[in-house]
Amino acid sequence: MKRNIIIVTGGTGFVGSNLISYLAKKTKYKIISVDNYSSGSKKNEINNNRIRYIKGDTKQISHLLNRYKNNINSIFHFGEFSRIYQSFLKFNQCIESNSIGTHEVFNFCLKNKIKLIYSATSATLGNKGKDKDLSPYAFTKAKNLELLENLNKWFNMKFEI
């Protein structure tokens, strides 16, 4: 089994698109972006025959990536709702993306033994962790970090922050 694919969720956002650009230049991996384009942009897509863009939601990641699952080396998960102020205004969208969608990504990685690289935030790590309950965004990110630690303990899930 050749694991020659890297997945980037949120691949048309600022961080994801810059990571894809870097990976395309510095590695030989095939790269697949999964993005719902809620804050990402088609303008950030890179024209390269090793890069594929899939429009979709992380809540359906198992369905979207099922055909690639045996060839995926790692998943960089940047495809979350990432606005502190807006997480109060769009609470349901924040929970759907950061809790439900992210848990689907975690489960897909766990089930298929794929290493996860998860994007943390100063909203949960800053101020010695005391700010983790200040917004729905920070709360969901803090709970996801806690869940990852437990998935590692319980199931030896491989991840990096």
Predicted regions and their residues:
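N-terminal Rossmann-like NAD(P)+-binding domain of SDR-like oxidoreductases, especially those catalyzing
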Residues: 1-161
